């Protein structure tokens, strides 16, 4: 029987990041997923970045993560957020071509010779003599020294559309929850939702506001210059709000009285109307999903209304009245594990050879999932090699802030990173990630020597120009000049905070 060093259950954003990071320093890695077609898929909003989230992606870029590289390759629309505010809250947001993104992920993953991929359904997980047995539906089993569970929102989950309920009764998903109950892991429920997708060929563009792309910086590799796709904006009005109120009985969110909590910063349209009754208009962003698809993502219209009500709702919104629904909106309720049972290295406190990463830890968003996947992957590989595990610090990275909050305070709602979550946000900026994390990345074995030397040459140039600041030519060294101005701006704070 072949014994694997690491087996990763689930191949979403956290699972793929875990596999890529572990494969840098370790061999004999296996990914088990129930559907190979969904490898690297963006199941909800096709966007990466945002306030706080882009800081995580930039940190992943320095650690050799796959998400920043794939998002730079597949971006079709870019926005620089908070540009008029201080540099510490400047954030980058990409609209992603979901097909290009998935294909790039698959290309990188299939080129890795030390990663095996298997499509299978898991029935049972058993710990036995410092090993883990993973049984599939055919009653065969894999043996692993370490497993990383990255099952996302698909553990014991149910989909709700109006009064219709569809349980995802795949043996793999349900048994993971049951297997972990046996080791006294606290399990509870969360929910999330997704809006409908429309046919963009039937939009009335004359009645929509246009949102143009910014030609901004990239996370790392600026090799996609086709980020010129337009997004569009429309609004609800009083008539639409009243229509939803009248048909609220057809919403599973209110009709079935959910006890689980959804993400605060991504509420459904029903939630918005009842929680903010004085708001007559709620913005709706229409975001194209791909160059190769006619689907458009209706950001801001997440709901769990019935099929017929969703059709009628679309017919009442300005600019999309004549469009057709390609995919309907729905809510999904799923199990998550209390992250306080984890060490900051993301292995379970009382089961050191089991790591948990992604939305099963109570987070929301691709960026948070990928960050956890990276930490779980690199630490599982270091554990195999009997090296000390990496414990991210909250004072020098947003990854540290994320894991510190999860493992110390747990969650009351799906956790989303923000710059406001960090006490040191003036120091943890998008522009100085190289200075903060380059040595850690090289120490962990994530950064090739060539790239390490390149980044060090940039740092050397920066300090050399800092000494000769009067001789700098603005247009020849604009990036360095800007960086010097920013760092001098925050010098007093950093000196007071860190060099008392």
UniProtKB/Swiss-Prot annotation:
InterPro entries: FAD/NAD-bd_sf, MnmG-rel, MnmG-rel_CS, MnmG_N
Keyword rRNA processing: no
One GO MF term attached to the UniProt entry: flavin adenine dinucleotide binding
Coiled-coil intervals: none
UniProt entry tagged with the keyword Signal: no
Subcellular location: Cytoplasm
Swiss-Prot/TrEMBL keywords: Cytoplasm, FAD, Flavoprotein, NAD, tRNA processing
Chief place of localization: cytoplasm
Cofactor: FAD
BP terms from Gene Ontology: tRNA methylation; tRNA wobble uridine modification
Residues noted as binding FAD in the record, renumbered to the chain: 10-15
One Gene Ontology cellular component: cytosol
Pfam families: GIDA
Sites where the protein binds NAD(+): 262-276
Protein family per UniProt: Belongs to the MnmG family.
PANTHER family tied to this protein: GLUCOSE INHIBITED DIVISION PROTEIN A (PTHR11806), PROTEIN MTO1 HOMOLOG, MITOCHONDRIAL (PTHR11806:SF0)
Subunit field text: Homodimer. Heterotetramer of two MnmE and two MnmG subunits.
Role of this protein: NAD-binding protein involved in the addition of a carboxymethylaminomethyl (cmnm) group at the wobble position (U34) of certain tRNAs, forming tRNA-cmnm(5)s(2)U34.
Protein name: tRNA uridine 5-carboxymethylaminomethyl modification enzyme MnmG
Organism: Carsonella ruddii (strain PV)
